[in-house]
Amino acid sequence: MMCEVMPTINEDTPMSQRGSQSSGSDSDSHFEQLMVNMLDERDRLLDTLRETQESLSLAQQRLQDVIYDRDSLQRQLNSALPQDIESLTGGLAGSKGADPPEFAALTKELNACREQLLEKEEEISELKAERNNTRLLLEHLECLVSRHERSLRMTVVKRQAQSPSGVSSEVEVLKALKSLFEHHKALDEKVRERLRVSLERVSALEEELAAANQEIVALREQNVHIQRKMASSEGSTESEHLEGMEPGQKVHEKRLSNGSIDSTDETSQIVELQELLEKQNYEMAQMKERLAALSSRVGEVEQEAETARKDLIKTEEMNTKYQRDIREAMAQKEDMEERITTLEKRYLSAQRESTSIHDMNDKLENELANKEAILRQMEEKNRQLQERLELAEQKLQQTMRKAETLPEVEAELAQRIAALTKAEERHGNIEERMRHLEGQLEEKNQELQRARQREKMNEEHNKRLSDTVDRLLTESNERLQLHLKERMAALEEKNVLIQESETFRKNLEESLHDKERLAEEIEKLRSELDQLKMRTGSLIEPTIPRTHLDTSAELRYSVGSLVDSQSDYRTTKVIRRPRRGRMGVRRDEPKVKSLGDHEWNRTQQIGVLSSHPFESDTEMSDIDDDDRETIFSSMDLLSPSGHSDAQTLAMMLQEQLDAINKEIRLIQEEKESTELRAEEIENRVASVSLEGLNLARVHPGTSITASVTASSLASSSPPSGHSTPKLTPRSPAREMDRMGVMTLPSDLRKHRRKIAVVEEDGREDKATIKCETSPPPTPRALRMTHTLPSSYHNDARSSLSVSLEPESLGLGSANSSQDSLHKAPKKKGIKSSIGRLFGKKEKARLGQLRGFMETEAAAQESLGLGKLGTQAEKDRRLKKKHELLEEARRKGLPFAQWDGPTVVAWLELWLGMPAWYVAACRANVKSGAIMSALSDTEIQREIGISNPLHRLKLRLAIQEMVSLTSPSAPPTSRTPSGNVWVTHEEMENLAAPAKTKESEEGSWAQCPVFLQTLAYGDMNHEWIGNEWLPSLGLPQYRSYFMECLVDARMLDHLTKKDLRVHLKMVDSFHRTSLQYGIMCLKRLNYDRKELERRREASQHEIKDVLVWSNDRVIRWIQAIGLREYANNILESGVHGSLIALDENFDYSSLALLLQIPTQNTQARQILEREYNNLLALGTERRLDESDDKNFRRGSTWRRQFPPREVHGISMMPGSSETLPAGFRLTTTSGQSRKMTTDVASSRLQRLDNSTVRTYSC
């Protein structure tokens, strides 16, 4: 049988059809029909395969039965034939009659068996040929399938892309074909093995059959020969019979003596031969029966072989069909693979295109943000130009009035008109540029929309990347687990190091005792110096003014108080003096030429420093009248002609002070070596516990500078703790005490957080800001900090003293701001050592000691290692800063004309900026004009404020002050004078009743000057974090709000991005709660006292739910009988404004937050009833007639706020006057009448869309 090879699938035709766009649908329909046919063929092939396998198993079983029967018959033949032949030859020789027809029948049967065997051999050869053909067909089909496997896979991918819901089963077809190949290969191996075994058995049977045929032929010849001899004669028969007998029988013959045979023996022998012949005939009959049974069995075996051959033929046909189908499937598979390759290439190109589009989108967003920032800057500049234009117009009118009497003013007027014309031209250019920028902004918005449309194409790729991200997250989790184990081992090592640090602390305490002893010696020397001063004062001038004696007494008191209070503060390293400002020096010609070389060099340094009087002033507000005296104002007192004795005494005192300085310097070096060892241990602990914190290595013997660069100050600004320091005047000691906490290791920083609140109660001058890197604490955790024992805090302070070394500060690279910060202590030290030496007459002797004290403490002051000073000194400095601001108020100076010290005082007292930002502004900002002209990027680059919310706070405050101090600003109604500024006495009178309360809150206790002067003056970040957020039920975000210094100015400018990224408020419900809290503040016009008054009035009554806090809501829930569920809304954001203003917040939402089970219907009914009563009695919401479950705002809410409504902000009479100019939004009465009930929804939509407000505070 020849193998019919199926024609291969033409691959060019479908590809060419796909290439043409017109015939695409025909190829798809053809391919679908082909796939349907393949599925049908697959089903039929599977059915036929099952049938063939069943028939093959039956044939194999029958063949095994036949082989077993054949083996049994063969054994019978082997056991029976040799004996039968021997007996047959013996019996036939002696028998008289035989049965020739039986032998003929046996011969015929043998011939028939031989013919049947030949036929079977032919059939077996045909079956072999058919099996070879089947194998060839299978191989051909496998080749076709492998060739078309790629095209089939491409088709599958295409169909899946077209209709993802209805995925076809081509993949299953391919899998079935592959399994069919494997099955047929295994089946072919089994058939080959069985055929080989069968052939071996057949060859063995043929050999046995040939041997049996030879034996039968020999028996047949013997039978013929016997019959011939029996037919000849009887005698001859006997003789032949005797000859044919065996030799053993002849031995028994007996002959007579005369040679004849005995007759009795002959008869007995004949009888025996007859018996043998009968026995042989019987056995011959049995053999015939056996042969007949064997022939019938052979016939059955032939029939079974015929059926097996037919089954094999069917199997080969099915195999051929399977091979044909498999070849077709392989061709389709190759086609699909080609399609898949094409789609993969398209996918890669699309992926690259989406990546480029995404990059372009990011670039466009950045450009858009920059354009918006530039646009805002242009608007600000435009507003400033308009203000300048108004000022110029006013001046022009005044000039025109004076023109009649003052003709020389006309020239000046002409100049101003020219300047005004130039300003108008610049204004016109700016407007044109703004229009151009608006056009560009519209184009960018269009490009952004197109980019967002293209960005949607990347979603599928992002989904695929999510699996990879999950895998990476699991790997990172494993790495973090390993890292955690390493951290635990490091903690054990840290405990050992802490024990070592305790020993170093003891050594430090011993050094502190030595320092106290030295302080006593210094006190003794001070008394001696006082005596010397009295003597020298009597020699120089007998009469000393009383004021000067008071000044010297004040100095003695301050120095003595420093020495006495030295042991109270463990973190103090050296003796501190009250910090003094750098005095101004006039450039006068020196009148004394007889000074020593050392003093003359110092005088030259003072002259050089006096050429830059305000370049790097650290604290200009500290200048007093005594310090304003210059070095050369009293040079005539030290001329050689009149006062040589005083000069000699001064030189002697200077030598004694130098000796004292050397001795103290040696003691300090010994103490610093002990502190350096403790610092090394602290650095080791910090490197183990906090890997990301870069602590500077300690280098013994190096001089430690007092400043940190502006960038490092801004980037490492610590978040506020439980209570940030009260807004007292910041000394460098307290500034660096705040910054020193940042350099602590993580475990010590946590320890310091616990003791910050307790230390604040007893030591107001030691308040620190703790770094809250841990999750936000809850109010319960905050209350627990007040129960710590005092001894525990004392131990903590003593253990923390070793970590406040100046080397632990992160000193950045040197830049201009750092250099300017370095100049202040150096100038002050030189001034104190020379200027006070040659001061007034009553300070001639005492100036040496004061110069020594100031020289030794100057470098220590900026690092915050000593106490602030006496209370009188603090009050004096605070008064100086108040006087600076009051002077600006009296002169009516705009903000742009403020000098550097006034701006710094404003930042500290009015704005309440932290010390690190104040220091950066002091170094970089020299006037209000520079401050007001700074843009957002310039604030970040020049001052180093990296936090965008900090920059927003500063910009809003600057805009507020610019609008308040401009000449066009209207007077306010909160102060008696009608101005935003009030005098120090007026403000003290206003703030006297509220001073106790403010001191408890810790925000403006030390600075009562600016209470209630602005709408947001009493709502700084302290109030927001400590009071307002807990009242909203969101105390967990307190640390983030305090870290970002969020005050009331900033609340209306916070976007969704700010809340999510910087303030970590990712919960949408919490953002909604915050927004309704802001709306409540707007309704109250940001009046803190009004809010507190209304809350106090509604403490025990169900009314005015708008101002209810989270605690008040909890108490209401407890009062209605749901005490067990009340605490579940702690830190949930549920407060009165949310209940009163949110139309979507009903009793079911409250029940969900209270975690009341749904099966507890009684509690839910109680809550529903009481909640409805609460809405009816305490809010402006009322039941809707159509649905009792939904509420809407009634029409009576406008009566509470009759004057006007601006975007949901209630403006009470006179309240708009207290707002800055940027907050006075104009609106018509029609707009106020159109105010609808969807105020809350519009607010929330604005917040969720992350829009940026254009008006500013």
From Swiss-Prot:
GO terms for molecular function: structural constituent of postsynaptic density; structural constituent of presynapse. The modification Phosphothreonine is found at residue 237. SUPFAM superfamilies: SAM/Pointed domain. Expressed only in brain. Residues 898-964, 1020-1084, 1108-1177 form the SAM domain. Residues 16-26, 709-725, 798-813 have a biased composition (Low complexity). GO terms for biological process: cell-matrix adhesion; dense core granule cytoskeletal transport; regulation of dendritic spine development; regulation of dendritic spine morphogenesis; regulation of synaptic vesicle exocytosis; synapse organization. InterPro entries: Liprin (IPR029515), Liprin-alpha_SAM_rpt_1 (IPR037620), Liprin-alpha_SAM_rpt_2 (IPR037621), Liprin-alpha_SAM_rpt_3 (IPR037622), SAM (IPR001660), SAM/pointed_sf (IPR013761). Residues 238-256 have a biased composition (Basic and acidic residues). GO terms for cellular component: axon; cell surface; cytoplasm; cytosol; dendritic spine; extracellular exosome; glutamatergic synapse; postsynaptic density. Keywords: Cell projection, Coiled coil, Cytoplasm, Phosphoprotein, Repeat, Synapse. The keyword Nucleotide-binding does not apply. The modification Phosphoserine is found at residues 236, 239, 687, 689, 817, 820. Forms homodimers and heterodimers with liprins-alpha and liprins-beta. Interacts with the second PTPase domain of PTPRD, PTPRF and PTPRS. Interacts with KIF1A; the interaction decreases in presence of calcium. Alters PTPRF cellular localization and induces PTPRF clustering. May regulate the disassembly of focal adhesions. May localize receptor-like tyrosine phosphatases type 2A at specific sites on the plasma membrane, possibly regulating their interaction with the extracellular environment and their association with substrates. In neuronal cells, is a scaffolding protein in the dendritic spines which acts as immobile postsynaptic post able to recruit KIF1A-driven dense core vesicles to dendritic spines. The N-terminal coiled coil regions mediate homodimerization preferentially and heterodimerization type alpha/alpha. The C-terminal, non-coiled coil regions mediate heterodimerization type alpha/beta and interaction with PTPRD, PTPRF and PTPRS. Belongs to the liprin family. Liprin-alpha subfamily. This is Liprin-alpha-2. The lineage of its organism: Eukaryota, Metazoa, Chordata, Craniata, Vertebrata. The gene is PPFIA2.
